[in-house]
Amino acid sequence: MIHRRELLKSAALLAAGRAFGAGADQLHFGCQTNAWPIAARDFATVLAVIRKIKDYGYDGFETGFANVEGQFEHAAEARRQIDGIGARFFGVHIFLLQYDAETHVAPAALYERVAAGGALLGAEHLILSGTPPADDAGRKRKAEALNRAGAYAGQAGLRLAYHNHGPEVEHNGTEIEFLLRETDPSKVWFLLDAGHAFHAGADVPAFVRRHHTRLAGMHLRDYKNGEQVPLGMGDFPLRAVADAIRQTGWHGWVLNEEERLTSKPGDSAVKPARDALFRAFGKGV
């Protein structure tokens, strides 16, 4: 078994030569793997989805930590296989059904292990989701926890990105604005789930204009009559968001996320979503 200190040291050494500014003067297009069924214990199924994402013309991918944590003990071979596909590993995402009761994000022991292991696999971001605290005291603890997680991720050679769901942007964005104020911009970035934000009533183009300097990436998803549909088939203001991105000169990652609560639509959702995304940004399909 690899000890955590050894894992972190190895990850930091491997990541030291990786520049986050590589290609920083252009947008990057990615896709979350969660649109497809994956057998987390069978890494071949993960690689097959990454290869499919690359074949669709995306620059890179994001995936849940459960899909890759089994590779941490023999990361060199897994990294070789990922690199062989030619897709960048935008980020490894920790989504849980239950979070730390005090911090409202993943426990430190988990995110430290995932940050170190993810870095060995070539991940560029550690992505954390969380639950909404009930008051400012809880939000303060959450912000402090994100700062600590961001510092640790930085030691491993990754950037930390906090991913929102709907509650963070409800009530005029009370929580997300608090986290933006109280987290250290040198340690904490945000992965704006623009679809969740839109569904919760946020003015997404305006948010992008205000906070683009804190954004590592955006998840784009669409809704029609309260149900998620492939991007471009609902009411999400895709063109307006693309215009806001152009106007700000932001150069991060825009990612299709076509997960569903009760199914894995795969190609039937990703292909039209990819086409809509690429058209909106003038990228050939």
Model-assigned labels for residue ranges:
Residues 2-30, 38-39, 43-54, 173-192, ...:
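Histidine-acidic metal/acid-base catalytic patches
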Residues 12, 16-17, 84-88, 97-190, ...:
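Active-site acidic/histidine proton-transfer and metal-coordination neighborhood
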Residues 29-33, 61-63, 89-94, 126-128, ...:
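Hydrophobic faces of well-ordered beta-strands that scaffold small-molecule active sites
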Residues 37-43, 64-75, 97-107, 132-140, ...:
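Acidic-and-aromatic substrate-binding clefts and catalytic sites of carbohydrate-active enzymes
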Residues 47-64, 121-122:
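Catalytic domains of carbohydrate-active enzymes, especially glycoside hydrolases
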Residues 52-55, 81, 117-120, 148, ...:
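Alpha-helical scaffold elements within enzyme catalytic domains, especially in hydrolases
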Residues 67-69, 80, 186-190:
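Histidine- and aromatic-rich ligand-binding microenvironments
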Residues 74-85:
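Aromatic-lined substrate-binding rim segments of carbohydrate-active enzymes
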